[in-house]
Every structure is written in C-alpha cells, then in structure tokens.
C-alpha cells in the first residue's frame, strides 16, 4: 500500500515535470547562460543562479500553458497523444493553474531579486509564446514557426539583461541566431510528421506549400542562420577562434539541409532535426568559450 502511494506520487511529479517540456527548458537555460557570460560586468553567483531558475520556471510555465491550450490537438497526434493532459494523467485545470503560478513566480522573483528589465523580458517571452504563438499563430498560418520562434529567442537577452540591467545590440544578435535557427529546426520535424499535423489541422509549411517548397525554405533559412551565427564575432574576445568554430558547425548544418533537399526521405530529415539541436548547443557553447579568458 505504502509502495503504491509512493509510486503514484512519483508518477504525478513526473507528469508535472513533463508539462514543463524539460528538453526545451534545458536549451533555454543554456542560451540564457550564454547571454550572461558574454555580457560585460559581473554578477553574484547566487543571483546568477536565481536568474537561471527564473528562466527555467518561465520556460516551463509557457510549456505547461501551451499543453493546456493544445490538449485537443495533442490528442489527435501520435507524437503528442501520450502527453500528461490528453492521456488523462493530469487535469487541464491543474495544468493551467500550474503554468500560471510558475509564470507569475518566475517574473516576480526575477523582478525582486535581479532587475526589472530582465523580468520584463521574461514576461514578454512567456506571453509571446502563449498568446502570439500558441493561441494566435500556430493554428492559423504557416508562418507560425517563423514569427513564433521569437518566443524562444529571448533567453540570451534575458541573461544579458540580468547582468547589465539593459538591452543591447550584442544581446539582440544572440536573439537573432535563435530566431533564424527555429524554422529549419521545426520544419525538419514537420516533414516527418506531416500526417500528424494534417490530422490536427495545423498549417505547417509542408502542409500548406508542400514538402518541396519547405525543403527549399529549410536550405534558405539554414544559409541565413549560418551567416547570422558569424555576427557574435563582432563582440567576442576570441573572435577568430569563434569564426572558425561557427563556420565549421554551420557548414555541417548546411550539409544536412542540402541532404534534405537531395534525398527527400525520412532519414535525412530526422538527421537534420537531430543535428539542429546539437548545433545550437554547440554554437552557444562556442559563444561561451570564446567570451571567457581561460588562457
């Protein structure tokens, strides 16, 4: 009996954890770290930790509210039908309350403990993801990912603002890198999940314009991404080293995009999607490494 109760509690905790979309949250926090490290000045380690926790909670808040709103279409898609809400393991009301609570807490703590600018940016990123992307764009236009991608591009700006109490062109460049990365990343996924998106009536690019045009868009955005990814060299301490690292990582990205156009199959699209995640981690790791003095 006692073991059964413990298992139920553990299962519930895991389901609420899944509402936060942890894989996205890890990436969000990592890019926020890049913003903090590249920013001029310094920050007390404890406040830096508080800032990152707030970013994580804010990201999780947006994820939970997104799952609450999308519970109807999640039920229709193979990829999402086993999520906590459509599977019935977490009630829609509980998920919404959980998401709103986390969002309010994250912004409030950021404002009180860190500064108002970083808190405002965090609030904008949450609201943009929920209202602009989830509620307005996702079900209405194939530009959903293009415009909606801005929501996930805020973390480096938030990290920068946490340190400097300001927004600058440098942090906006980091924003642009993620903004340009988002479309090819999600289009590679959507090409392999066309039936799911069609069943849920989500107007992804490949559903509206067809797979051929979408593959061309992937290549175009990949080239634009790689060009944008070179811009941080303008303010990083090890500019030449960063340029070489970003160029290599970017060439591999374009190679995968070309493979998607050339082979037009599930395998090439899956590899493109997988590499795009590794690419963003690697690129921002390069940004972090090239902004600190180790030798």
From Swiss-Prot:
Keywords, ordered alphabetically: Cell membrane, Heme biosynthesis, Membrane, Transferase, Transmembrane, Transmembrane helix
Name the domain of life. Bacteria
The EC number(s) attached to this protein equal 2.5.1.141
Q: Tell me, which GO biological process terms does this entry list?
A: heme O biosynthetic process
Q: Quick one: which pathway?
A: Porphyrin-containing compound metabolism; heme O biosynthesis; heme O from protoheme: step 1/1
Which Gene Ontology terms cover its molecular function? protoheme IX farnesyltransferase activity
Name its cellular compartments.
Cell membrane
The membrane topology of this protein is: Multi-pass membrane protein
**GO annotations of cellular component type:** plasma membrane
Q: Which reaction does it catalyse?
A: heme b + (2E,6E)-farnesyl diphosphate + H2O = Fe(II)-heme o + diphosphate
For this protein, the record's InterPro entries field holds: Protohaem_IX_farnesylTrfase, UbiA_prenyltransferase, UbiA_prenylTrfase_CS, UbiA_sf
Q: Which segments cross the bilayer?
A: 24-44, 45-65, 94-114, 117-137, 144-164, 171-191, 216-236, 240-260, 272-292
Q: Which Pfam families does the record cross-reference, listed alphabetically?
A: UbiA
**What else does UniProt say about it?**
Carbon 2 of the heme B porphyrin ring is defined according to the Fischer nomenclature.
Q: Which family does it belong to?
A: Belongs to the UbiA prenyltransferase family. Protoheme IX farnesyltransferase subfamily.
Q: What does this protein do?
A: Converts heme B (protoheme IX) to heme O by substitution of the vinyl group on carbon 2 of heme B porphyrin ring with a hydroxyethyl farnesyl side group.
Q: Which HAMAP family match?
A: CyoE_CtaB (MF_00154)
What is the protein name given in its UniProt record? Protoheme IX farnesyltransferase
Provide the gene name from the record.
Answer: ctaB
């Amino acid at each position: 009996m006692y073991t059964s109760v413990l298992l139920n509690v553990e299962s519930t905790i895991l389901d609420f954890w899944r509402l936060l979309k942890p894989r996205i949250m890890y990436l969000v926090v990592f890019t926020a770290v890049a913003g903090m490290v590249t920013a001029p000045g310094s920050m007390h380690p404890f406040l830096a930790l508080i800032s990152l926790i707030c970013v994580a909670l804010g990201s999780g808040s947006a994820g939970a509210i997104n799952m609450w709103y999308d519970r109807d279409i999640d039920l229709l898609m193979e990829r999402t039908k086993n999520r906590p809400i459509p599977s019935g393991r977490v009630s829609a009301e509980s998920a919404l309350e959980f998401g709103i609570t986390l969002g309010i807490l994250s912004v409030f703590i950021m404002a009180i403990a860190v500064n108002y600018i970083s808190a405002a940016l965090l609030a904008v990123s949450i609201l943009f993801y929920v209202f602009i992307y989830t509620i307005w764009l996702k079900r209405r236009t194939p530009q959903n990912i293009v415009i909606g991608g801005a929501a996930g591009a805020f973390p480096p700006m938030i990290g920068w603002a946490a340190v400097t109490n300001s927004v600058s062109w440098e942090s906006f460049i980091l924003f642009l890198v993620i903004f340009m990365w988002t479309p090819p990343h999600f289009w590679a996924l959507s090409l392999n999940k066309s039936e799911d998106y069609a069943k849920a009536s989500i107007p992804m690019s490949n559903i509206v314009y067809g797979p051929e045009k979408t593959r061309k868009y992937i290549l175009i955005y990949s080239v634009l991404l790689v060009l944008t990814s070179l811009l941080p060299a303008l303010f990083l301490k090890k500019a030449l080293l960063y340029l070489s690292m970003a160029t290599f990582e970017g060439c591999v990205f374009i190679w995968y995009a070309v493979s998607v156009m050339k082979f037009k199959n599930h395998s090439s699209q899956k590899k493109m999607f997988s590499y795009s995640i590794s690419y963003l981690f690697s690129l921002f790791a390069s940004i972090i490494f090239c902004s600190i003095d180790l030798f």
